[in-house]
Amino acid sequence: MEKPAQRATAIIVAAGRGIRAGGGEPKQWRRIAGRSIVEWSVNRFAAHHAGFDVVLVIHPDDEWRLNGLDLPTTLRVVHGGDSRAASVKAGLAVCCDAGHVLIHDVARPCVSLAVIQSVLDATRAGGAAAPALPVTDALWRGDTHVSGTQNRDGLWRAQTPQGFDVSAIRAAHAAHDGTAADDVEVARLAGIDVAIVPGDEANLKITGPEDFARAEALLTGGDMDIRVGNGFDVHRFGPGDQVWLCGISVPHTRGLQGHSDADVGLHTLTDAIYGALAEGDIGTHFPPSDPQWKDAESHIFLTHAVELAANRGFSITNADLTLICEQPKIGPVASAMRARVADLLRIDVARVSVKATTSERLGFTGREEGIAALATITLVAR
């Protein structure tokens, strides 16, 4: 009878403190498609049919971040050190002496079960293995100018997980007290031969802000979280000599009436954002019964909605506003309105449309009793 394979351990190294990926916190705790990067990476190994014992190495200050995460109950959590090597050593310290270990960077949440299996099979067969992709781009040498080229034959882009015999890699790390690019370098310095198995372009390492969108597309199968919100508002004319529309003062024989400055354009855009977020409307956040909002400038409301969207992880990608009125004429000030709206939404003016129409003299707008506005906003999760 064939002897069953020994159970393997997976060490997820997640003790880093770097925040260059943005977000104001270590990247492994940021969320992608509703889950933290830690959850994605840990559960990749927990879901593998090999039945890994999973060890998560974190910084001591991050212990509280585990609360409420979707992690396996069998997960072992240990505290890492001041360097990656120290964190790997902490993880290896709790591994059993026999068997094999796969060491994985938490910042690669898109690793496939196939890559994990390939590394595990090659490690069991030869004692050590790691995934990599051949370098296909031309390589240059130089600083601000090209001083030469580099032959790319035999060059590889390293990935994780990197697999080893537990005892061998533990001894290699114990003997190594310097810096190393990864565990393969530590292993080679100890005389361990490491096999190369095919890597995967999807197994990207999240390093900069732009990598989050790529990772989300990979993890969700390209099914991005896109929201569309609609807004509609009406304000009647009253005494005055100007109207505020889209943050621009437009001279007119009458003004618009309202609790605030009655900017029907900004109100409609604000409600469209709240609608896309399922966050009610302006009245929910700025009740007209509250005297502090009497005669308030409407950009306050729109800025609140924009910041709420950003805090929820959404970017505004498009805004389309239609003003419905007979007077005043919108065409002469439409460009200024677009620029002001783009500034408030924090997007390029090319993503903002402000246009006007009439109701062919029908209804209250046709009778010039007021102005109506309709807006559509598109939000995309970052």
Swiss-Prot record:
Q: Which reaction does it catalyse?
A: 2-C-methyl-D-erythritol 4-phosphate + CTP + H(+) = 4-CDP-2-C-methyl-D-erythritol + diphosphate; 4-CDP-2-C-methyl-D-erythritol 2-phosphate = 2-C-methyl-D-erythritol 2,4-cyclic diphosphate + CMP
GO MF annotation, one: metal ion binding
Pathway assigned in UniProt: Isoprenoid biosynthesis; isopentenyl diphosphate biosynthesis via DXP pathway; isopentenyl diphosphate from 1-deoxy-D-xylulose 5-phosphate: step 2/6; Isoprenoid biosynthesis; isopentenyl diphosphate biosynthesis via DXP pathway; isopentenyl diphosphate from 1-deoxy-D-xylulose 5-phosphate: step 4/6
EC number(s) on file: 2.7.7.60, 4.6.1.12
Q: Where does 4-CDP-2-C-methyl-D-erythritol 2-phosphate bind?
A: 233-235, 259-260, 281-283, 357-360, 364, 367
The answer to whether the entry has keyword Nucleotidyltransferase is yes
Q: Which Pfam families match?
A: IspD (PF01128), YgbB (PF02542)
Which parts of the sequence are annotated with region: 2-C-methyl-D-erythritol 2,4-cyclodiphosphate synthase? 227-382
Gene3D superfamilies xref list: 2-C-methyl-D-erythritol 2,4-cyclodiphosphate synthase, Spore Coat Polysaccharide Biosynthesis Protein SpsA, Chain A
GO biological processes = isopentenyl diphosphate biosynthetic process, methylerythritol 4-phosphate pathway; terpenoid biosynthetic process
Superkingdom of origin organism: Bacteria
The record, for InterPro entries, names: IspD, IspD/F, IspD/TarI, ISPD_synthase_CS, MECDP_synthase, MECDP_synthase_CS, MECDP_synthase_sf, Nucleotide-diphossugar_trans
Write down the required cofactor(s).
a divalent metal cation
Residues at the site labelled Positions MEP for the nucleophilic attack: 152, 205
> Which residues make up the binding site for a divalent metal cation?
233, 235, 267
Q: Does the keyword Chaperone apply?
A: no
Where is the segment annotated 2-C-methyl-D-erythritol 4-phosphate cytidylyltransferase? 1-226
The similarity comment for this entry is: In the N-terminal section; belongs to the IspD/TarI cytidylyltransferase family. IspD subfamily. In the C-terminal section; belongs to the IspF family.
Classification via PANTHER family: 2-C-METHYL-D-ERYTHRITOL 2,4-CYCLODIPHOSPHATE SYNTHASE, CHLOROPLASTIC (PTHR43181:SF1)
This chain's function reads: Bifunctional enzyme that catalyzes the formation of 4-diphosphocytidyl-2-C-methyl-D-erythritol from CTP and 2-C-methyl-D-erythritol 4-phosphate (MEP) (IspD), and catalyzes the conversion of 4-diphosphocytidyl-2-C-methyl-D-erythritol 2-phosphate (CDP-ME2P) to 2-C-methyl-D-erythritol 2,4-cyclodiphosphate (ME-CPP) with a corresponding release of cytidine 5-monophosphate (CMP) (IspF).
Please state what the protein is called. Answer: Bifunctional enzyme IspD/IspF
**What gene name is listed for this protein?**
ispDF
